[in-house]
């Protein structure tokens, strides 16, 4: 829907190109605005910048001249650019309106919105909601921080579709009228304080997600963080999720996901592992129920959805052994979540780039580790760690060799977990490449029939 006229003949300055700035500039031009794009990087050889210039859009790059503010433009800010950047700081002082392209997505689309934010879990929740829609006859288009520019997707959705948008705290700061029908706050912990300066500012940024909601809308949030999340501004109907007790919303009871007293699915039938993922699942299920997704489609998704690639991703089963790819676990905190996600014996594949870290903080999470296959620059450190805890330790050359060596020690019902707790750059260009090598080697060991 491009009949929105609120920006026609208005001066608009897009600060920061990247994907979102590029799409926002094109959209603003279609809406009749006088658009200028500004980026601190030199864009003289940038293909997107040249494309915009061919459309008659002015591109100023290499610095942030404050003279760009002299025509009192509306600012559309790339979410990654902090408010301390000179041109944004000056725009604030002058009282200029500052938006993000997520606000534009709301202005041009009549589709109802499911918006997801939170410190952890938002990508998993957004992806799971998208998968549940896909299993039904309804359409839910993913957008936002998950990699699909919201203002581009908003031009493609029908009023009968849902726009399912992952929002970072950076994007939420640019909200003026944005109003999701269903808002989800997965959790709020301390994060991005370099951008927000303090925890209170960060929390307030997250709360922007519901500031325009009315009594006809829904907020879904963690029951055990309700005091952090809720405020006097909240007008939406609030529903909760909890893995610990019955709440007004959705919860776990006697091993089942329960909504309004009705059992939906046994948690043992879920493919996605981990207590933290149980919370993500509850939030996604509740949102989809409210959006009218059939229970059958929700169950189909929960029994097949294997997670985000390289984030505790279920790869497959060989005989009785499940394999999980958690290559994105490049620090000990992420690996703590992974090790804590299984009750079965674990063969843990770990190691990678040596940044001078010690790994003793993982000891409390190693109870279910039966054996370790270690590789990379930190191989010796992990071998020492395993030996100190009486674990069986095998050394490998790399991830592929580690999967091969697993075959010599694996026992029925063992879980094979790649969760390196280290960056990949000692042996692989990216954590994605490392994860793909793990998956390829797993498949090579599958029996051929």
From Swiss-Prot:
GO terms for molecular function: ATP binding; UDP-N-acetylmuramoylalanine-D-glutamate ligase activity. The keyword Cell wall biogenesis/degradation applies. Disulfide bonds: none annotated. ATP binds at residues 118-124. InterPro entries: Mur-like_cat_sf (IPR036565), Mur_ligase_C (IPR004101), Mur_ligase_C_dom_sf (IPR036615), Mur_ligase_cen (IPR013221), MurD (IPR005762). Its main location: cytoplasm. It is found in: Cytoplasm. Its EC number is 6.3.2.9. One of its GO terms (cellular component) is cytoplasm. It catalyses: UDP-N-acetyl-alpha-D-muramoyl-L-alanine + D-glutamate + ATP = UDP-N-acetyl-alpha-D-muramoyl-L-alanyl-D-glutamate + ADP + phosphate + H(+). Pfam families: Mur_ligase_C, Mur_ligase_M, MurD-like_N. Pathway: Cell wall biogenesis; peptidoglycan biosynthesis. Keywords: ATP-binding, Cell cycle, Cell division, Cell shape, Cell wall biogenesis/degradation, Cytoplasm, Ligase, Nucleotide-binding, Peptidoglycan synthesis. GO terms for biological process: cell division; cell wall organization; peptidoglycan biosynthetic process; regulation of cell shape. SUPFAM superfamilies: MurCD N-terminal domain, MurD-like peptide ligases, catalytic domain, MurD-like peptide ligases, peptide-binding domain. It comes from the Bacteria. The keyword Membrane does not apply. NCBIfam families: murD. HAMAP family: MurD. Belongs to the MurCDEF family. Cell wall formation. Catalyzes the addition of glutamate to the nucleotide precursor UDP-N-acetylmuramoyl-L-alanine (UMA). This is UDP-N-acetylmuramoylalanine--D-glutamate ligase. It comes from Staphylococcus aureus (strain MRSA252).
């Amino acid at each position: 829907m491009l009949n929105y006229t609120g920006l026609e003949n208005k001066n608009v300055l897009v600060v920061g190109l990247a994907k979102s700035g590029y799409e926002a500039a094109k959209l603003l031009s279609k809406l009749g605005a006088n658009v200028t794009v500004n980026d601190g990087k030199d864009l003289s050889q940038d293909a997107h910048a040249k494309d915009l210039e061919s459309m008659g859009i002015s591109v100023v790059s290499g610095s942030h001249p404050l003279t760009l503010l002299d025509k009192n433009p509306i600012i559309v800010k790339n979410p990654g650019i902090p408010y301390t950047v000179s041109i944004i700081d000056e725009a604030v002082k002058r009282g200029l309106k500052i938006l993000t392209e997520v606000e534009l997505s709301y202005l041009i689309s009549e589709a109802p919105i499911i918006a997801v934010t939170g410190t952890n879990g938002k990508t998993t929740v957004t992806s799971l909601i998208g998968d549940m829609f896909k299993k039904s006859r309804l359409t839910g288009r993913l957008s936002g921080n998950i990699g699909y520019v919201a203002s581009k997707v908003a031009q493609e959705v029908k009023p009968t579709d849902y726009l399912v948008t992952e929002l970072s705290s950076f994007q939420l700061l640019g909200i003026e009228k944005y109003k999701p029908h269903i808002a989800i706050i997965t959790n709020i912990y301390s994060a991005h304080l370099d951008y927000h300066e303090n925890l209170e500012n960060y929390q307030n940024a997250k709360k922007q997600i519901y500031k325009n909601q009315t009594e006809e809308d829904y907020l879904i949030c963690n029951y055990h963080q309700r005091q952090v999340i809720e405020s006097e501004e909240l007008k939406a109907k609030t529903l909760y999720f909890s893995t610990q007790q019955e709440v007004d919303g959705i919860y776990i009871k006697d091993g089942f996901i329960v909504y309004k007293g009705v059992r939906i699915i046994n948690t043992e039938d879920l493919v996605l592992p981990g207590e933290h993922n149980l919370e993500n699942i509850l939030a996604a299920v509740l949102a989809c129920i409210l959006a009218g997704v059939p229970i059958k489609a929700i169950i189909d998704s929960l029994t097949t959805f294997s997670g985000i690639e390289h984030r505790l991703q279920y790869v497959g089963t060989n005989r009785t052994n499940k394999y999980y790819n958690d290559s994105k676990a490049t620090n000990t905190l992420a690996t703590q979540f992974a090790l804590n996600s299984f009750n079965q014996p674990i063969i843990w594949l770990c190691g990678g780039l040596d940044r001078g870290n010690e790994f003793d903080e993982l000891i409390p999470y190693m109870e279910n580790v039966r054996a370790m296959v270690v590789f990379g620059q930190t191989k010796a450190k992990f071998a020492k760690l395993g030996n100190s805890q009486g674990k069986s330790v095998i050394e490998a050359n790399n991830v592929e060799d580690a999967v091969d060596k697993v075959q010599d020690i694996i026992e029925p019902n063992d879980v094979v977990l790649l969760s390196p707790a280290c960056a990949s750059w000692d042996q692989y260009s990216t954590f994605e490449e490392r994860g793909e090598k793990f998956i390829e080697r797993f498949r090579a060991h599958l029996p051929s029939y």
